[in-house]
A protein has these predicted regions:
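Conserved ABC transporter NBD signature motif
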Residues: 56-68, 79
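Conserved ABC ATPase signature
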Residues: 137-141, 145
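Conserved ABC ATPase "signature" region
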Residues: 115-133
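The feature captures the beta-strand-to-loop junction immediately N-terminal to the Walker
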Residues: 33-35
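Catalytic Walker B motif of ABC-type/P-loop ATPase nucleotide-binding domains
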Residues: 162-166
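Helix-to-loop junction immediately C-terminal to a conserved catalytic motif
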Residues: 48
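Hydrophobic anchor residue at the start of the ABC signature
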Residues: 151
Length: 191
């Protein structure tokens, strides 16, 4: 469960999140909508432990998330195994030398067995139509291929919570159709 209680955040004294209070239950889907600069990406960064409330609290599974907590390697690892973040711009997320390595990065950090990692990566490559691109460096891919790689890299981690910043950006019609089928499957799986 995610709980936000009186959360405030500002950039240079410009309020972005103002006294936000919300509870998100397991399996609940939430869509953030608003104009540019209204705080959607800021909230997603906060939910992923990349920034922290300047006022109020953010709790995940009953534990208040703080900068100190996230500096604790064991806690940070536990948290990031449970919360996945697909960035708006996939170039912000992709850094490995091949698509296959990109998809394996999270599971390797989680300490999974090599056979399990291979299976997760192969399944994600197949599901997202990336098998033929597995050995290519992400920087050589089209925007839509990069976005699918970014989504696949989170899929291989199997997080409890998915957060996506403009998941439809960079996707073509086929990618959008796939995403429209995929998102309900996450909800059905209780994520």
């Amino acid at each position: 469960m995610i709980q936000l209680d009186d959360v405030c955040f500002a950039y240079d004294d410009r309020p972005i999140l103002s006294h936000l209070t919300e509870t998100i239950e397991p399996g609940q889907a939430v869509l953030l909508s608003g104009p540019n600069g209204s705080g959607k990406s800021t909230l997603l960064r906060l939910l992923n432990g990349l920034i922290f409330p300047q006022q109020g609290t953010y709790s995940f599974d009953g534990t208040i998330i703080t900068a100190g907590k996230m500096r604790d390697h064991a806690y940070s690892k536990w948290f990031h195994q449970r919360v996945g973040y697909v960035w708006q711009n996939p170039d912000s997320q992709l850094f490995c030398s091949s698509v296959r390595e990109e998809l394996a990065f999270g599971p390797v950090q989680m300490g999974l067995k090599p056979a399990d990692i291979r299976q997760r990566v192969d399944d994600a490559l197949e599901l997202l139509g990336l098998t033929r691109l597995a050995s290519r460096p992400p920087y050589t891919l089209s925007g839509g291929e990069k976005k699918r790689t970014a989504i696949a890299s989170i899929l291989t981690m199997n997080p409890q919570v998915w957060t996506m910043d403009e998941p439809e950006s960079y996707l073509d019609a086929d990618g959008l159709a796939w995403l429209e089928d995929f998102l309900p499957s996450l909800k059905a799986a209780g994520k």
